[in-house]
Design a protein with these regions (language model features):
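Membrane-embedded transmembrane alpha-helical bundles that form the catalytic cores
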Residues: 1-283
Length: 283
């Protein structure tokens, strides 16, 4: 191996940030901010927990319950602050163009014409996915599912890992964190199986979804020219397109990760055969 096993995570982190910077440029600051917010927020939750563990030994029994509620309130404040901070950035970036245009339209009623100051705002790559992953991390730490990591590189790689930053799936730190950080020796079986999964995903995306999309657009854009049978066919093709699109992207993501020896959760496991709404959501 060219890179020692213990340093492979560093190469993966650099490559992931390079990939992100090429695709998002200056907007990389937002994922850096999210990373730092959950890292230091997690450490603060650890500190509160450790302080409680030490203090409760010296407290009288009658005061422990009150002290525990104070600690719980402090932890909740930290968790809610981090969640709102990350959600606020997501909402601002996703809807600033829309609300900016609404503001301009309202001013035009009073014959005040200005251009939308937010019209050139771009969305950072994968902001929805990494924001939800960041929130899942801080909420899990708050609930005591695991201790927050004191390794900034490990937390950073968990969020920016390049295969899942574009289309998900939304990662869980307890399932993905150690895998991306530990480093894996080259494995021929993983490499070939991962490559096969990538090609299968590309087949679904390019051959099935993109082809179905041509007919769907034709029928939906000119629906007045087609009778009921064609509309039904269009609906069925649209369902097929959605399935092939998302399933194909998930296969590409999982295959890319598998080539690095990393197993990612299947995020689109035949949802259309679900028997209940909750099962559909889980699949």
């Amino acid at each position: 191996s060219i890179v020692p096993l213990k340093h492979k995570w560093k190469v993966l982190l650099i490559f992931s940030y390079l990939f992100y910077f090429i695709n998002s440029g200056k907007y990389i600051v937002f994922i850096l901010f999210s990373t730092l917010s959950i890292y230091f927020g997690g450490l603060l939750l650890n500190k509160i927990d450790d302080g409680f563990s030490m203090a409760k030994k010296a407290l009288p029994k009658e005061n422990k319950k009150e002290f525990k509620s104070i600690i719980g309130w402090q932890k909740k404040c930290v968790c809610v602050s981090i969640v709102l901070l990350n959600l606020g950035i997501l909402v601002y970036l996703k809807y600033s163009v829309f609300f900016g245009q609404v503001f301009c339209d309202l001013l035009s009623i009073f014959h005040i014409k200005i251009s939308n100051p937010m019209q050139n705002m771009m969305l950072p790559l994968g902001i929805s996915f990494y924001t939800l992953s960041a929130i899942s991390y801080i909420v899990d730490v708050y609930r005591g599912k695991y201790k927050a990591s004191d390794n900034l590189g490990k937390v950073a790689l968990f969020l920016v890992f390049f295969p899942h930053i574009v289309e998900g799936p939304i990662g869980r730190f307890d399932l993905l964190g150690d895998q991306v950080y530990e480093g894996h020796p080259f494995d021929y079986k993983n490499a070939t199986m991962g490559l096969q999964l990538v090609f299968w995903g590309l087949f679904k995306k390019i051959v099935i979804a993109d082809r179905a999309n041509m007919y769907v657009n034709q029928i939906f854009n000119f629906h007045d020219q087609y009778d009921g049978l064609y509309v039904i066919i269009g609906m069925l093709l649209y369902t097929l397109q959605l399935y092939a699109e998302f399933s194909g992207c998930m296969d590409i993501v999982r295959g890319s990760a598998q080539m690095f020896g990393i197993e990612m959760s299947e995020n689109f496991a035949r949802p259309f055969i679900s028997k209940t709404v909750s099962e559909f959501w889980r699949r």
